[in-house]
Swiss-Prot record:
Basic and acidic residues composition-biased segments: 445-467
Pfam families: WD40
Compositionally skewed regions (Low complexity) per UniProt: 421-434
Keywords: Nucleus, Repeat, tRNA processing, WD repeat
Protein family: Belongs to the WD repeat TRM82 family.
Gene3D superfamilies, sorted: YVTN repeat-like/Quinoprotein amine dehydrogenase (2.130.10.10)
Record-given protein name: tRNA (guanine-N(7)-)-methyltransferase non-catalytic subunit wdr4
Subunit structure and binding partners: Forms a heterodimer with the catalytic subunit mettl1.
Top-level taxon of origin: Eukaryota
Main localisation: nucleus
Amino acid sequence: MSTTAVFIPPQIMVTSNVEKVPISIITHSSDSNFIAYRLNNKLNIFDNKLNKLGELESGSQHTGIIRSIEFTKNNQSLITSSSDKFLKIWDTTNNFKNIKSINTNKKIICSILNKDDSEILVSDKCGDVFKYSLIDDSKNKIEVSGDKSAKHDEKESDKNLVFGHYSSIVDIKFSPCFNYLLSADRDEKIRVSHYPNCFDIESFCLGHTKYVTEILLVPGRDDLLISGSGDGTIKLWNWKQGKCLQTVDFNSKHENAITIPQVVFKVDATTTTNQLIFSIENSNNIYILPMNVEKGEFNQSELKTIPLTQSSPISIDLIDNGKTILASLLPTTKEVDVAIAFDSTTLSQQSDNKVVIAINSVDASTTLKPAELKSVLESIEKKQYRKHVSYSKQMMNSTDNKNKEDDDLSLDEQDIDDTTDINNNNKNKNQETIQDSRPLKLRKMTIEGDKEIQKELEEKESKKQEE
């Protein structure tokens, strides 16, 4: 077992090189009875008690890419969200029967359940977060007009809107006390908002130079947050203060590193050490970075790696009450499995793990059309985030003819809500005009931001009266 990372040439996810559809999301119930994962773009369940895969009604599956899978805290329900704009509730006590589907009319990126699992927050591709009741459907009604010119005003008055970012939100987490909401976006920042009054911002965690990939809260230290990024670093934060406590840089070990925090866990009750399991996109290693919880710092000298001979890891979860590391792989050949397991203490491979055997026994050969498979793979890759630009970057690009980065920063119309209308013919208009075209929902939702918006509206009204 090596204690230092070895550079392995990147394996680009090319559609023609993928022999099986990879598992892109893995999670488990807190009682360890169930493991849920996305395979072949469908929800799959492994029942630990019965030691077998569950069978879901074929007609109840999502029609789009599943974006999130989360068990309720009492483990009686499973909530999934999808790019098909639906939330689905599955009854874990009744063979995972789909008991409710909620049409959000939003292209969902990620979601999180509230404290009592009565509501779910979802972020859409425009950087907005909306709240939906899982109990009272009357709270989820949204009036939609057929008049496209009224779309922006519609979304402004959407009673489900909680808050918004300038750019797409890639991850959201509640603080352990559920009084704060932490949101990370493609514009390199992490925002800490009071909840439910999210316009009241506690702090910003600023320091990443590229998009944030994932954020994780630290068990045993409610004040600490871990983040990964396209800048190749792992950062440790005091999130309430917005203070970066430590940065671990992996660019010297991996070219164009993209770090993805996967799981952070406490080794046992008698130690002050936590372990962060993370991956680096296109690297054939699983990394384990020890962390001293009391001191609030990573121990870089004790970095461990689990080399994978078959493929790079995609999604990683800790199962069997913390005893097993379960990872999904990118199968570039028919011989490569879709899942692999390791002992979390010895880091030795568990070839006889019952979950892995069951998952790998399913025919995962791709049956998706090339375009569908491409969409699935793009939803896995974290570097997809650099393909999308926020309204703030759109504003800068339109007033500067210089090349800002590369073509990946151009707006992808599929990833901007259908109700958002940006006319490419307006590139030569001045900054004020472009700023006015931005929906208010994407403006900085602070008390100061609210004042700025009110001032702009007053100026507009004054100009109209003068005319």
